Amino acid sequence: MDVEMKIETDTEFYGGGEHPEHLYTTLYRYRLQRIWNEQENPLLVIGCNPSTATAEELDETMRQVIKIARNNEYGGVIMCNLYAYRGTRPDDMKNAARNISQNNQDGFAYVIGPHNEAQLVEAAALVEDVVFAYGNIAVEGWTNVQGMMDNVIVSGNFYARAYKDRVIQLMRQLGKNLFAFETTAAGNPMHPLPHDAELKNQIRNIALIFKKR
């Protein structure tokens, strides 16, 4: 029997934390969550970047991951992203990074967001299982974007690949079980929308590439 979904608001909805005001701003969305059964662990999903969806107006992606989590008997969903910059399309985020890079600044630092890594760690502390769902778009198409790595300016596509590996390694170091809904032909974890939300055990029955590394 399904537990009735509990909808919380404002900073309580986002779980508080040291900097609750940074979980949701006009420019960034660091974390969005729904908890409906506090007796079960929630599922952490890490996508590419957030849309303009809010706690009051969920988008199709968030509705889909909620359905998948409920059908896999999790107690809730915490949605985070590699990049916290809010945009309806990933190109919005990449164009913002390009504009910053044109001024000889770190375009990646801008779209990742100053509090994103801290929020990923804080969210991971609440879960056992993490699903990566950032697709190919997170690691491709970063032309004319520059990032700073070890005090060296590097190209966009190189930085993007190194950064997603860093986040994966971070979740491993925190002892999390790593999954994906499926992988793309390029080997990246697929976005949740192509998948049937009614399929039971969709997450836990998939032997993931991340588990084998």
Spans of model-derived segments:
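Glycine/proline-rich loop-helix segments at beta-alpha junctions forming the active-site rim
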Residues: 93-213
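Short, well-ordered beta-to-alpha junction loops that form the rim of enzyme active sites
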Residues: 47-48, 82, 134-136
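Active-site and ligand/interface coordination hotspots across diverse enzymes
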Residues: 1-59, 71
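Conserved alpha-helical elements of sugar-nucleotide-dependent glycosyltransferases
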Residues: 57-64, 163-166
